[in-house]
Amino acid sequence: MRLFLSLLVVVLSMVLKGPTPAQGVPDVSNPFDVLEEFGKTLEDNVGEFINLITQSELPAKTRDWFSETFRKVKEKLRINS
């Protein structure tokens, strides 16, 4: 599910970004060159997206919230037992 959402975000960003002037007129001399260029662009965009996620505070906050909630549940179960 996460991979699907990540790919969806990358594809949407590429679509919304639109073609740059150098990409305005595609050269169709070799379809594999176009595919290779798309792969490199996709790799760069996914790399940027992963860096954005890893530098975000959201994963740390989520991990802290789960740890705190789990600790509270353990304490309640320990008190009731």
Swiss-Prot record:
Molecular function, one GO term: fatty acid binding
List the GO terms this entry assigns under cellular component, sorted alphabetically: high-density lipoprotein particle; very-low-density lipoprotein particle
One GO biological process from the UniProt record? negative regulation of cholesterol transport
Q: Which UniProt keywords apply?
A: Lipid transport, Secreted, Signal, Transport
**InterPro entries named in the record:** ApoC-1_sf, ApoC-I
Q: Name one Pfam family in it.
A: ApoC-I
Subcellular location per UniProt equals: Secreted
Residues making up the signal peptide according to the UniProt record: 1-24
**Keyword Methyltransferase, does the record have it?**
no
User: Is Cell cycle one of the keywords?
Assistant: no
Q: What else is known?
A: Apolipoprotein C-I is present in acidic (APOC1A) and basic (APOC1B) forms in P.paniscus, P.abelii and P.troglodytes and perhaps also in baboons and macaques. The two genes for ApoC-I arose through a duplication process that occurred after the divergence of New World monkeys from the human lineage. In human, the acidic form has become a pseudogene sometime between the divergence of bonobos and chimpanzees from the human lineage and the appearance of the Denisovans. Pseudogenization resulted when the codon for the penultimate amino acid in the signal sequence was changed to a stop codon.
What family does this belong to? Belongs to the apolipoprotein C1 family.
PANTHER family registered for this protein in UniProt: APOLIPOPROTEIN C-I (PTHR16565), APOLIPOPROTEIN C-I, ACIDIC FORM (PTHR16565:SF3)
Q: What protein am I looking at?
A: Apolipoprotein C-I, acidic form
Naturally occurring in which organism (per UniProt): Macaca mulatta (Rhesus macaque)
